[in-house]
Amino acid sequence: MNLQKEMGMSVMWITHDLGIVAEMVHKINVMYAGFIIEQGLVDDIYDETLHPYTKGLLGSLPSIDEAPGTKLISIPGLPPDLITLPSGCPFYARCTYRRDYCREERPELESVNANGHAVACWRWREI
C-alpha cells in the first residue's frame, strides 16, 4: 500500500470477502455477473447497503457477537450463465425482492447521494 501512495496509483482487489476489503480500501464496487450493481465509499456500503446481492454478501459474514454455531446467511440459487445472460437484472433469479418487471430490463447505476453511492436495482428504495 505504500507503493500505491508513492506512485499515486489505484489498486483493485477482487474478492467475495467484504470483511477484509473494509480494512483495505476507501471505495467499493460490488459486481455481479460482470456488472457493477453497487458502488460507493466503504462506510456508505456498510451502513446503507442498497442492493440485495450486497446485503447477501454482508449477511454471510460471521460476527463475533453471534453465538458459536449460528447459521450464516447464504444467497439462494446459482449465478447466471455468463454466456447467455438474462435481459433484465442479472441477479433476478436469486433475488428475494424480485418482481416481474425486474426480468425485463437491466437497471442502470443510479446515484443515491453526493458521496458517489450508486445502485443498479429497480427496488432499492423499497428494500
Task: Give the location of each predicted region.
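P-loop NTP-binding/switch modules centered on Walker-like glycine-rich loops
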Residues: M1-T70
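Charged, flexible cofactor/metal-binding loops and thiol motifs
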Residues: V42-I127
